[in-house]
Amino acid sequence: MKILYILAFAIASLFAVSADDVRNWDQIGQYNRICQESVRNLFIEEQSEALANMYAKACLKMDKVNELVVPTVMLYKTKEARENASLYSTIIFQKKMLYLALCDGVDISYLRTPKINYILSEIFDKFTERAYVKKSDTYVFTLENGERAELFIKEEEEVKKMVIAIYAGDKLSSIKIYW
């Protein structure tokens, strides 16, 4: 039985993620490896604001806004951490309010939030300022970089998903899906 425990521990150690792994992945831009449950568990276990922040930034790069909740709660010890937590919670708020407006027709035009360099934030700002053209159930925006974005709801398996389709010229360059 002891051999089984030792073997299980050895195998788990082989696949364990370390803080150094996360830093290396961050430096080389492997955000998909950072925005994973194993890294989330690591920063919770170590109570590391630096790892929590790297995780949150990686999840933003991967457009996994829902993953910002846990690091937002953990970032409170330093001024920089609190500022980052405020930005992450603002993005979560913007996503939720846009979703509410699109799915349930709630007027959010009176809302103003801090300007954040993130596509969902730019769409939120333009939506609340009514800086769009509405075509059927699609909202069309001209982004600050000159690209065009379309915002709409798509239902899959009885789940309404908010979609942002980004176009460079007439060519679809990116699709972001939130719910």
Region spans (language model):
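N-terminal accessory interaction module
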Residues: F127-W179
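Short secondary-structure boundary micro-motifs
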Residues: A8, N41-F43, D125, K135-S136
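Compositionally biased non-globular segments, especially hydrophobic aliphatic-rich helices
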Residues: I11-F15, K171-S173
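Intrinsically disordered, low-complexity segments enriched in small/polar residues
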Residues: M1-I3, G29, A165
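Alpha-helical protein-protein interaction scaffolds
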Residues: F15-M97
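Sec-dependent N-terminal signal peptides
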Residues: I3-S13
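Short linear motifs at secondary-structure transitions and domain/linker junctions
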Residues: W25-N32, P114-Y118, D125-E129, D137-T142, ...
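Surface-exposed, polar helix/loop patches in the mature regions of secreted/periplasmic/lumenal proteins
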Residues: V69, V73-S136
